[in-house]
Design a protein with these regions (language model features):
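Non-catalytic structural scaffold of enzyme domains
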Residues: 1-141
Length: 141
């Protein structure tokens, strides 16, 4: 069962869920991927926290992660690019695989882009300021 740490914003969670449904070759309802979705839009705003203008959402993210695991999630995803600023902290002590939207995006780009290609990132000001994608690009080579 996949645990979805979502609600930041809710439409990103809905978009992720729809993409999983469309990518599943299900012949009937019971053939779909089981998911637990936590959609909590009350989690502290990520952009403000990254820019030093608000409180950190990390305690709420950790609580959501732990709730999903306690409810039976066997793997986790978080369909919010900006929240991946806290991804390293969310991995600490995590007892199930936690997939990174940033790692997955960059690995997919590596297959699609030709050597020497320029790639642009459309993201929030905070995501760009935090260099979430830049740091992962360096880490993954």
């Amino acid at each position: 069962m996949i645990g979805v740490l979502g609600g930041m914003g809710p439409l990103a969670t809905v978009d992720f869920f729809n993409k999983v449904l469309k990518a599943t070759s299900a012949r009937g309802d019971s053939d779909h991927v089981p998911m637990l979705i936590q959609s909590d839009p009350r989690i502290a705003p990520r952009p403000e926290a990254i820019l030093g203008e608000g409180r950190s959402p990390l305690p709420e993210l950790l609580a959501g992660r732990n709730r999903l695991i306690a409810a039976g999630a066997m793997a986790l995803v978080m369909p919010c690019n900006t929240a991946h600023f806290w991804y390293p902290e969310l991995l600490k002590g995590c007892s199930v695989p936690f997939l990174s939207i940033v790692d997955a995006s960059i690995k997919e780009l590596a297959h699609l882009a030709e050597d020497g290609s320029k790639i642009g990132i459309i993201a929030t000001r905070a995501t760009l300021a935090a260099q979430i994608f830049d740091l992962t690009l360096v880490r993954l080579g």
